[in-house]
């Protein structure tokens, strides 16, 4: 029987526009754009040039620091252009897709008979190893490290999050194959929610299943690592998004790379919130054609409202695009007397409004911050929504002043920026906590290089 871990700290935010469990397949488009900067910590080095032909699974670029880590093309076709920014930074690789897709055949493999090196080499060869992330630093992993464990969280509980049980339908065999492959490299832990009932999750083979019972962010893999096997200095764990586990399984079951993923279209500015199947690199302009209720005063988010990034129709599906969210920008909002006026249609984590009496009522929130940055107030706000054994407020202050010794002592090795998403939401100081944590992780990584 699976171990159950109960969490009390956290906050569930119910928003209008949850994706209905209906799906449409995005039709083939002529151009795809792969953006290397969506792979955190990777310094891309191109291995293709304009005019080159590639098949699905061929490498487009490698990590300059670890050249054996390749990144696969999601489609076959011709490299149409390489988009660059300041100092020739690679912003995107634009691919002109073939009408009939051609796949690089890596050969089917029975994962039960493979060694750890066989699995690692197969993922490296197919350009999928870079989808594995590591703690500390929350970056694409170093293939030369040996993790003490591999963690997969199948629980997505952020606002408007993609329901992985729905995404899993039809992919059960590939998911189990992917888990078995990971278990060859290290002890693998699968975290699920108490309400998840899919047999391949509850009775997953070759992994240790842990049930998490509690509010958001119980689904964050960093939270699960903190409660199962905390990361100390000198230790490394790998983390894998459950969608990428499916990618790995497809590789071993078919011998081909298939980067088709299920994406939730959510938010109050979506005409019909639903799911779509789209390849990595698919432009948002294709996915969101006729899908939005407005074009003005719109905040388009690549991801969910808490951890996603501000986006636009020229963006494309990336490594973290499990959701595309559309909410009002709020620039045209005019509220008489502001927060002083009692309201029933506003959400509050305190008792300023009546939301604490409304149960699971869904709210139509916009993108306004409603205030500027203020001094940090040591009020315990972060701790109320951070179910980890760390001192969040002290850690943030130590990062801001650049105290390396202090941030190590305060537990930065086992956190990711997303672990502070809720703390950022409730923060009365209006600080960009996720950005601060990312800066701290990058600073520590550079110090330890």
Regions found by a protein language model. Name each.
Residues 68-76:
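Short coil-to-beta-strand transition motifs
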Residues 1-15, 22-23, 80, 85, ...:
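Mobile cofactor-carrier "swinging-arm" domains
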Residues 58, 64, 75, 83, ...:
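Glycine-rich, histidine-containing beta strand-loop boundary motifs that form or position
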Residues 49-62, 81:
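Short, well-structured beta-strand-loop connectors
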Residues 1-47, 62, 212:
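N-terminal, Lys/Arg-enriched amphipathic/low-complexity engagement segments
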Residues 42, 48, 65-68, 272:
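Short, solvent-exposed loop/turn positions at domain surfaces
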Residues 69, 83-286, 290-449:
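Buried, small/hydrophobic-residue-enriched core segments of structured protein domains
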């Amino acid at each position: 029987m699976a171990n159950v871990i109960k969490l009390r700290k956290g906050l569930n935010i119910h928003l209008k526009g949850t994706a209905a469990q209906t799906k449409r397949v995005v039709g083939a488009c002529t151009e795809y754009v792969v953006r290397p900067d969506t792979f955190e910590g990777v310094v891309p080095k191109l291995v293709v040039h304009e005019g080159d032909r590639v098949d699905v699974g061929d490498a487009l670029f490698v990590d300059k620091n670890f050249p054996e880590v390749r990144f696969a093309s999601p489609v076959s076709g011709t490299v149409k252009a390489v988009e660059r920014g300041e100092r020739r930074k690679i912003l995107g690789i634009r691919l002109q897709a073939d009408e009939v897709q051609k796949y690089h055949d890596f050969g089917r493999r029975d994962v039960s008979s493979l060694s750890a090196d066989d699995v690692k080499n197969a993922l490296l060869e197919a350009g999928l190893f870079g989808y594995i992330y590591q703690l500390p630093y929350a970056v694409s992993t170093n293939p030369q490290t040996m993790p003490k464990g591999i963690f997969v969280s199948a629980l997505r509980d952020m606002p408007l999050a993609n329901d992985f049980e729905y995404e899993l339908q039809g992919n059960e065999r590939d998911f189990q194959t992917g888990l078995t492959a990971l278990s060859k490299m290290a002890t693998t832990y699968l975290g699920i929610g108490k309400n998840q009932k899919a047999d391949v999750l509850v009775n997953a083979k070759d992994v240790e299943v842990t049930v998490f019972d509690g509010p958001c962010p119980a689904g964050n893999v960093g939270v699960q690592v903190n409660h199962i096997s905390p990361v100390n200095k000198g230790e490394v764990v790998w983390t894998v998004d459950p969608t990428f586990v499916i990618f790995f399984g497809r590789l071993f079951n078919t011998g081909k790379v298939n980067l088709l993923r299920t994406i939730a279209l959510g938010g109050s500015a979506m005409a019909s919130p639903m799911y779509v199947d789209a390849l990595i690199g698919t432009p948002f302009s294709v996915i969101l054609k006729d899908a939005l209720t407005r074009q003005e005063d719109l905040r388009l988010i690549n991801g969910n409202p808490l951890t996603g990034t501000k986006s636009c129709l020229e963006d494309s599906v990336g490594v973290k695009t499990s959701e595309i969210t559309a909410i009002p920008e709020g620039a045209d909002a005019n509220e008489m007397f502001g927060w002083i006026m009692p309201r029933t249609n506003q959400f509050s984590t305190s008792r300023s409004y009546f939301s604490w009496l409304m149960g699971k009522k869904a709210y139509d929130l916009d993108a306004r911050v409603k205030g500027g940055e203020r001094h940090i107030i040591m009020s315990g706000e972060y701790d109320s929504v951070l179910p980890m054994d760390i001192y969040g407020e002290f850690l943030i202050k130590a990062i801001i002043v650049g105290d390396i010794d202090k941030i190590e002592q305060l537990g930065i090795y086992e956190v990711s920026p997303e672990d502070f998403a809720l703390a950022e939401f409730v923060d009365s100081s209006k600080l960009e906590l996720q950005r601060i944590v990312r800066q701290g992780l990058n600073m520590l990584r550079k110090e330890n290089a």
